[in-house]
């Protein structure tokens, strides 16, 4: 008796997303390290100088973490209430932060007590930054004002009162000492010049502004608010270049890659989008477990840190390139291994024993081997099989049809079992790779269960969905045939014109030749 031959499962190429250089680059991070903070992480900022520590603002504390440490190496807790927006100076030696009580505090990284305290705001300060000369601080608060402070003298220099709602974000120019930008809940983004004591450019974002980012060159400005990320050309007076709407909820933070070629945005929809700064299309996306409030990238994009509303700090480090020398070389077999048995001489009474290889059969193959056709079909109709490997289910249906027992395997099923079969047909009937097999199976099911249609509302609903799917597929086929007919007509017309022009050309040449002969 011949052995059982397992069912041949036809495999198909997986149609995944296109692998690009951005996909490889942004996927090259290790498994994230999660750190629990005391409250929602409202700001993350990396030091511009080595060793590239980063400051995390959460609740009433500011933690300084080493680049690869999971415990804070320093903590600033001299706040009466919630702390906001801790930001490093360009040299990485000073840190400035706002607070809920309206104060602005300046810290030395090597100390604990604040070096300076700037008092002047009457409400919470959500935005602070250092100017390009390193000796001034810009702050924006919920009292609708923007203030410029002098660090050496601890005095207020200027106050701007052009916003009509909370000032929640801001940044200073990296090139010009006198220019800085603020965003407000009054839907406007304003660029101020300390030399004129007023704003020089004002743009309308259209939503409460949560974050602003000025490119290092100072020519482009990015604003985030609502579901929109907008890019403005400041060299053309604040002209809108592009409006991006790729998030489903409010965008809360912005960040620029080290090369300046990629823009990152974080949102309450728990996603971080990566945009190209040339085409402004999404080139990659990160998913997180909670709504995102803050985002920062380390030097050379070696580390990406994301702060979330649930107090979780997610830290991803880039994978290090494995050295070839570090991989242990496989030991080569000894010489005697290759010459083993070379000089062996066969004898007349030797007995050759073949050890048959044991074949492992899948459960559905075992059922088919023992002619349990209904049980084999039940196994491949399990959700784990129909969703992950539908080609296995289709192959078993095809094998049962080849044996002529598909009708027997489908008959005698209750409401739940026939619903599973119909669900699989509805999900995969329109796929070209499965259509020939499943259409035949659908016809057999209709023939078997046509007398009992109308007795079960659940089954009747499935049949109606299947009917609508078939009608839609017929409409698609009709439209495709009409399109093919129009294309055939166009091709035929073009071919006729070309042949006519060739005949006319040949006729004219012959006429000229005859005239020449007669003359």
Swiss-Prot record:
Organism for this UniProt entry: Bos taurus (Bovine)
InterPro entries xref list: U3_snoRNA-assocProt_15_C, WD40/YVTN_repeat-like_dom_sf, WD40_repeat_CS, WD40_repeat_dom_sf, WD40_rpt
Name of one Pfam family that matches: UTP15_C
Chain ranges passing through the membrane: none
Protein known as: U3 small nucleolar RNA-associated protein 15 homolog
Function: Ribosome biogenesis factor. Involved in nucleolar processing of pre-18S ribosomal RNA. Required for optimal pre-ribosomal RNA transcription by RNA polymerase I. Part of the small subunit (SSU) processome, first precursor of the small eukaryotic ribosomal subunit. During the assembly of the SSU processome in the nucleolus, many ribosome biogenesis factors, an RNA chaperone and ribosomal proteins associate with the nascent pre-rRNA and work in concert to generate RNA folding, modifications, rearrangements and cleavage as well as targeted degradation of pre-ribosomal RNA by the RNA exosome.
Keyword set includes Transcription: yes
Nucleotide-binding among keywords: no
SUPFAM superfamilies with a match to the protein in the record: WD40 repeat-like
Gene Ontology cellular-component terms listed: endoplasmic reticulum; fibrillar center; nucleolus; small-subunit processome
Gene: UTP15
Crosslinked residue numbers (Glycyl lysine isopeptide (Lys-Gly) (interchain with G-Cter in SUMO2)): 249
């Amino acid at each position: 008796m011949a052995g059982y031959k397992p069912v041949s499962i036809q495999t198909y190429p997986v149609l995944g997303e296109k692998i690009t250089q951005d996909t490889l680059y942004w996927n090259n991070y290790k498994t994230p390290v999660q750190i629990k903070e005391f409250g929602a992480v409202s700001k993350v900022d990396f030091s511009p100088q080595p060793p590239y520590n980063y400051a995390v603002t959460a609740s009433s504390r500011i933690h300084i973490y080493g680049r690869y440490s999971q415990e804070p190496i320093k903590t600033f807790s001299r706040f009466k209430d919630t702390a906001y927006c801790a930001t490093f100076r360009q040299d990485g030696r000073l840190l400035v932060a706002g607070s809920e009580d309206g104060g602005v505090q300046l810290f030395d990284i090597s100390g604990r007590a604040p070096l300076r305290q700037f008092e002047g705001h009457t409400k919470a300060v959500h935005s602070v930054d250092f100017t390009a000369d390193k000796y001034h601080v810009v702050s924006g608060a919920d009292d609708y004002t923007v203030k410029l402070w002098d660090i050496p003298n601890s005095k207020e220099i200027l106050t701007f009162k052009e916003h009509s709602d909370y000032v929640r974000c801001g940044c200073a120019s990296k090139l010009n000492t006198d220019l800085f930008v603020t965003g407000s809940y009054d839907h406007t983004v304003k660029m101020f010049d300390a030399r004129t004591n007023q704003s020089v450019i004002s743009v309308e974002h259209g939503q409460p502004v949560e974050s602003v980012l000025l490119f290092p060159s100072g020519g482009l400005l990015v604003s985030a608010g609502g579901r929109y990320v907008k890019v403005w050309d400041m060299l053309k007076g604040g002209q809108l270049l592009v409006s991006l709407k790729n998030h489903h909820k409010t965008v809360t933070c912005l960040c620029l890659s080290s090369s300046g070629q990629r823009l990152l945005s974080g949102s309450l929809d728990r996603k971080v989008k990566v945009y190209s700064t040339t085409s402004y299309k999404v080139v990659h996306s990160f998913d997180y477990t909670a709504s995102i409030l803050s985002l920062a990238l380390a030097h050379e994009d070696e580390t990406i840190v994301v702060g979330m509303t649930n107090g979780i700090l997610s830290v991803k480090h880039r994978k290090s390139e494995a050295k070839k020398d570090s991989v242990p070389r496989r030991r080569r077999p000894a010489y005697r291994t290759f010459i083993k048995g070379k000089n062996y001489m066969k004898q007349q009474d030797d007995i050759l024993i073949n050890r048959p290889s044991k074949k492992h059969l899948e459960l559905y193959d075992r059922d088919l081997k023992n002619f349990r056709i209904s049980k084999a079909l039940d196994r491949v109709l399990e959700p784990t099989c129909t969703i992950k490997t539908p080609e296995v289910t289709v192959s078993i249906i095809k094998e049962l049809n080849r044996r002529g027992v598909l009708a027997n395997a489908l008959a005698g099923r209750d409401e739940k079992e026939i619903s599973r079969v119909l669900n699989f047909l509805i999900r995969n009937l329109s796929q070209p790779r499965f259509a020939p097999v499943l259409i035949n199976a659908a016809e057999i099911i209709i023939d078997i269960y046509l007398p009992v249609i109308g007795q079960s509302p659940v089954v009747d609903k499935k049949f109606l969905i299947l009917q609508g799917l078939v009608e839609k597929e017929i409409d698609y086929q009709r439209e495709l045939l009409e399109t093919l007919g129009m294309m055939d007509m166009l091709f035929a017309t073009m071919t006729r014109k070309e042949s006519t022009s060739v005949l006319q050309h040949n006729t004219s040449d012959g006429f000229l030749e005859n005239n020449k002969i007669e003359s």
